[in-house]
Amino acid sequence: KEKYITDDEREKCRKVADAFAELYEIENILVVDAGRYGFVKLQYYRPPQGFEDAITFTDSQSMFENLWEEWLDTQLFLLAKGTPMAGMGYNEIFRCLPKEKQEELMNRKAGFAKTAGIE
């Protein structure tokens, strides 16, 4: 049977998935190991149909970037909720934040990368 992900990338993807565990608690997202097919990000669960969105990853770098964007967007949404920033786009919200908060958020990327073993 054909494999769509190398054993090395599969191990790296597993580390990336584990690094973003907190995201799955705060957002309607789940990342699952789909064996020889890679890892699948399931998003927007709607009963009874199930997940509306499924993205398959076979490389850890693109999976990391995707989950990082998801995490950052979620944080920005939560920060803007109930404020005048609520109607803004994510980039606008980020620019409105104090420099310290911007740095704090961006430093989390380095933390996730270290946990995931991404250079």
Please place each PLM-identified region on the residue numbering.
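Short intrinsically disordered terminal tails
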Residues: K1, F112-E119
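Acidic, low-complexity, intrinsically disordered interaction modules
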Residues: A34-E100
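Assembly/interface hotspot detector across virion components, adhesins/toxins, and nucleic-acid enzymes
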Residues: I29-V32
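Active-site or metal-binding loop neighborhoods of secreted/extracellular toxin and effector enzymes
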Residues: I93, E103-A113
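Short intrinsically disordered, low-complexity segments
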Residues: A21-E25, G38, K114-G117
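Negatively charged, low-complexity tracts enriched in Asp/Glu with abundant Ser/Thr
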Residues: K1-E27
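Short, intrinsically disordered, low-complexity terminal segments
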Residues: R14-D18, F77, T83, A110
